[in-house]
From Swiss-Prot:
Keywords: Membrane, Transmembrane, Transmembrane helix, Transport. Residues 537-660 form the STAS domain. GO terms for cellular component: membrane. It comes from Stylosanthes hamata (Caribbean stylo). Residues 16-38 are annotated as: Disordered. It is a multi-pass membrane protein. The gene is ST1. High-affinity H(+)/sulfate cotransporter that mediates the uptake of sulfate by plant roots from low concentrations of sulfate in the soil solution. The chain crosses the membrane at residues 106-126, 131-151, 156-176, 185-205, 208-228, 269-289, 296-316, 350-370, 425-445, 452-472, 486-506. This is High affinity sulfate transporter 1. InterPro entries: S04_transporter_CS, SLC26A/SulP_dom, SLC26A/SulP_fam, STAS_dom, STAS_dom_sf. One of its GO terms (molecular function) is secondary active sulfate transmembrane transporter activity. The keyword Membrane applies. Signal peptide: none annotated. It is found in: Membrane.
Length: 667
């Protein structure tokens, strides 16, 4: 909106502009203005010319090696380089030198605590992936050991998680409907192998920035939708409905239809009583832990207590004889090798790769988000690329030892943090406890009711529905809220993979929208200063008579150059019409503030050439203010500076206004 000011106010603005311009003159004025009274103005600097090799090297290093990982190898002996290399691959060799009994005490307690949480969760999560319960325990034995040696997070707890288990189970069952077949198990190992390969390649190739394309808003919606889907899937276990009679679909309509269809002939009242009783118990313990952080352990051990008590109850009452579904047999012993089970050829190889890539990316996104959260809380650095290599290695090794896709668990990591863990040794302690469970305790889980495992899963995923985050998204960014809701409804009304696809699509759509439709703003001068700001943000900022100042707030590339040119011309037409209506001087100079423009390509240069020619026809002079080093170098290389005129490129907007603005005497 044009600033309507009286002649006296305009004179004051112009006088302030000239008195406050602290820069120095760099060339003659334009339009016949007398600029001999102006002081010298600094020219816009041009960076030293770089060779093509130097430009490529700089761009490559900034993209893939911004943290300069090889800097510490410089000027070191061969043995020292080997030592540093091993420490880089296995961080435990670096921080392990300073490990002491005090740290071990904290890690030992934390490891025991998360083990009590992970064992019942592992049994339950394996069922989400349509696998036998012992594969969950296998996965919590091998993967944490590998991560402890290669990971950089001190707090993350590794193992199967609900969302990835559900995603894996859904995608695998789309390929092989008979989840009890041996090929289904082999495909699970194959997907795990390629999930690990995907994660490792991202880390080795330094492509970790790719996972940032999935926005936080989309993740919030996807996780919430997945949590509800997981909860709905547990109704069959909670109500005692047979797997053979329950729908294989995951959308809310199909699940609820299946639930109500079996209300008279499928529900088992004893199962419902057991399931609801322990679900209420688990939710109460979570509430207690949330209200009093010192009692976090109450929530951590409640799943194990639920398993022990319910197993004993079913055993002494023989409730399994009256329709209460139980776990039955669980294999004991250490993980058997599965290297010869992976599909490296054949008709299921392509399916294994597809499922593995998707599951690997989702698992990696969740792990990195968790790792960054706790790293920020404890103020230490998390190396994203090392994390990817560690995650990839543990899933590759896991696929060869009867494990399915594992990642960082938020609930277990939170307990690990609250229990006082100091290093990744807590994962080793947890792994040893799981090993002892596999060797000694697994036969005792025979009478564990499936309803309790369903209750454990429901209680675990409740926190994934983050209402507060959704409300905050609505308040801050409506587009982010749409992305969140799109992913959420895609999961609960269609399927997990459709919800994930919607989340990715909306995230990319937002990026494309921001790139192709960047923000521009009309600037005005703040009273009493030489500062120019957005007139919508600062209504008192006064526009300069006869001048239009526009700021472009993004890089100018082929994807947005035409839009920026047309938007600037629309600003010119709209502002010109308003000023004519207000009987203000016509616009004679268009100043483009380019401070926020980090780069420009050939399409952007061409757009400015067209803009210049259009403005010439309208008898409006184009002026550029403060182009950055990359931009000014390209302007010189394209000879656009010669077309516009060296005297029309300024260090600041204030310099441009002081040189080409109307004289106070004219008013």
């Amino acid at each position: 909106m044009s600033q309507r000011v009286s002649d006296q106010v305009m004179a004051d603005v112009i006088a302030e502009t000239r008195s406050n311009s602290s820069s120095h003159r760099h060339g003659g004025g334009g339009g016949g203005d007398d600029t001999t009274s102006l002081p010298y103005m600094h020219k816009v600097g041009t960076p030293p010319k770089q060779t093509l090799f130097q430009e490529i090297k700089h761009s490559f290093n900034e993209t893939f090696f911004p943290d300069k990982p090889f800097g510490k190898f410089k000027d070191q002996s061969g043995f020292r380089k080997l030592e540093l290399g091993l420490q880089y691959i296995f961080p435990i060799l670096e921080w392990g030198r300073h490990y002491d009994l005090k740290k071990f005490r904290g890690d030992f307690i934390a490891g025991l605590t998360i083990a009590s949480l992970c064992i019942p969760q592992d049994l339950a999560y394996a069922k989400l992936a349509n696998l036998d319960p012992w594969y969950g325990l296998y996965s919590s034995f091998v993967a944490p050991l590998v991560y402890a040696f290669m990971g950089t997070s001190r707090d993350i707890a590794i193992g199967p998680v609900a969302v990835v288990s559900l995603l894996l189970g859904t995608l695998l069952s789309n390929e092989i409907s008979n989840t009890k077949s041996h090929d289904y198990l082999r495909l699970a190992f194959t997907a795990t192998f390629f999930a690990g390969v995907t994660q490792m390649l991202l880390g080795v190739c330094r492509l970790g920035f790719l996972i940032d394309f999935l926005s936080h808003a989309a993740i919030v919606g996807f996780m919430a939708g997945a949590a509800i889907t997981i909860g709905l899937q547990q109704l069959k276990g909670l109500l005692g409905i047979s797997n053979n009679n329950f729908t294989k679909k995951t959308d809310i309509i199909s699940v609820m239809r299946s639930v109500w269809t079996h209300v008279h002939h499928g529900w088992n009242w004893e199962t419902i009583l057991i399931g609801l009783s322990f679900l209420i118990f688990l939710l109460i313990t979570k509430y207690i832990a949330k209200k009093n952080k010192k009692l976090f352990w109450v929530s951590a051990i409640s799943p194990m207590i639920s398993v022990i008590v319910s197993t004993f109850f079913v055993y002494i009452t023989r409730a399994d004889k009256r329709g209460v579904s139980i776990v039955k047999h669980i294999k004991s012993g250490v993980n058997p090798s599965s290297a010869n089970e992976i599909f490296f050829h054949g008709k299921y190889l392509g399916a294994g790769v597809r499922v593995g890539v998707v599951a690997g990316l989702v698992a990696l996104t969740e792990a990195i988000a968790i790792g960054r959260t706790f790293a920020a809380m404890k103020d230490y650095a998390l190396d994203g690329n090392k994390e990817m290599v560690a995650m990839g290695t543990m899933n590759i090794v896991g696929s060869l030892s009867s494990c399915y896709v594992t990642t960082g668990s938020f609930s277990r990591s939170a307990v690990n943090y609250m229990a006082g863990c100091k290093t990744a040794v807590s994962n080793i302690v947890m792994s040893i406890v799981v090993l002892l469970t596999l060797l000694v305790i697994t036969p005792l889980f025979k009478y564990t009711p499936n309803a309790v495992l369903a209750s454990i899963i429901i209680a675990a995923v409740v926190n994934l529905v983050n209402i507060e985050a959704m409300v905050l998204l609505w308040k801050i960014d409506k587009f982010d809220f749409v992305a969140c809701m799109g992913a959420f409804f895609g999961v609960i009304f269609k399927s997990v993979e459709i919800g994930l696809l919607i989340a990715v699509a909306i995230s990319f759509a937002k990026i494309l929208l921001q790139v192709t439709r960047p923000r521009t703003a009309v600037l005005g001068k703040l009273p009493g200063t030489s500062v120019y700001r957005n007139i919508q943000q600062y209504p008192k900022a006064a526009q300069i008579p006869g001048m239009l100042i526009i700021r472009v707030d993004s890089a100018i590339y082929f994807s947005n150059s035409n839009y920026i040119k047309e938007r600037i011309l629309r600003w010119l037409i709209d502002e010109g019409a308003q000023r004519t209506e207000s009987e203000l001087p016509e616009i004679q100079h268009l100043i483009t503030e380019m401070s926020p423009v980090p780069d420009i390509d050939t399409s952007g240069i061409h757009a400015f050439e067209e803009l210049y020619k259009t403005l010439q026809k309208r008898e409006v002079q184009l002026i550029l203010a403060n182009p950055g080093p990359v931009v000014i170098e390209k302007l010189h290389a394209s000879k656009l500076t010669e077309l516009i005129g060296e005297d029309k490129i300024f260090l600041t907007v204030a310099d441009a206004v002081a040189t080409y603005g109307p004289k106070t005497a004219a008013f």
